[in-house]
A protein has these predicted regions:
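Helix-adjacent hinge/juxtasegments
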Residues: 61-62, 66, 70-103
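Zinc-dependent deaminase
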Residues: 2-31, 79, 95-168
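Short, basic and Ser/Thr-rich N-terminal targeting/leader segments
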Residues: 32-36, 82
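Active-site phosphate/pyrophosphate-handling residues
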Residues: 16, 45, 67
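A short acidic/small-residue loop/turn micro-motif
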Residues: 53-56
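Short beta-strand scaffold segments in enzyme catalytic cores
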Residues: 36-44
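A cross-family signal for key residues in well-ordered alpha-helices
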Residues: 19, 38, 70
């Protein structure tokens, strides 16, 4: 399986659920967290939602994908999310990519690649390691511009806040 750009195939559905992931990312943004959001869909229904809360929860585990996977597993009563699709606003890190493989999620739809920490094609593709017993289809580029703009705005504001705090 490889990373592919989403152009026309199931665009409407992918955009619909990516917009839900963006809503989650905006919750993180409101908490001064890196704005990453995630939803997990099963049979046309969202069964798990999450957004980045690392600073708020003081936990390296409080990533959007991990939270959404926990909620989805609880909702369906199984750790295996074999008939689900995960939508996330930024390419998963190594921890989240590993959790996606472990949860047996067959498909991940991403908005933006993460050249500094991405493990679904940017640095490494954990989701497609043939030696694992499960590989994941990856679709990239759904609402990419909107998500990239939100991330850029967040980091621009963060730099301004840091600069202002140094001058006080």
């Amino acid at each position: 399986m490889s990373v592919q750009l989403s152009m026309s195939y199931s665009d409407n559905i992918d955009e619909k659920y990516m917009r839900e992931a963006i809503k989650q990312a905006k919750k993180a943004y409101a908490l001064d967290e890196v704005p990453i959001g995630c939803v997990i869909v099963h049979e046309g229904k969202i069964i798990g939602r999450g957004y980045n809360r690392r600073n708020t929860d003081k936990s390296t585990l409080a990533h959007a994908e991990i939270t959404a996977i926990k909620k989805a597993s609880k909702k369906i009563g199984d750790w295996r999310l074999e008939e689900c699709t995960l939508y996330v606003t930024l390419e998963p890190c190594q921890m989240c990519a590993g959790a996606i493989v472990q949860a047996r999620i067959p498909k991940v739809v991403m908005a933006s690649m993460n050249p500094k920490a991405g493990c679904a094609g940017s640095i490494i593709n954990i989701l497609d390691i043939k030696e694992f017993n499960h590989q994941v289809e990856v679709v990239n580029g759904v609402l990419q511009e909107e998500c990239s703009t939100m991330l850029k705005e967040f980091f621009k504001e963060l730099r301004i806040k840091k600069k202002m705090s140094k001058t006080l």
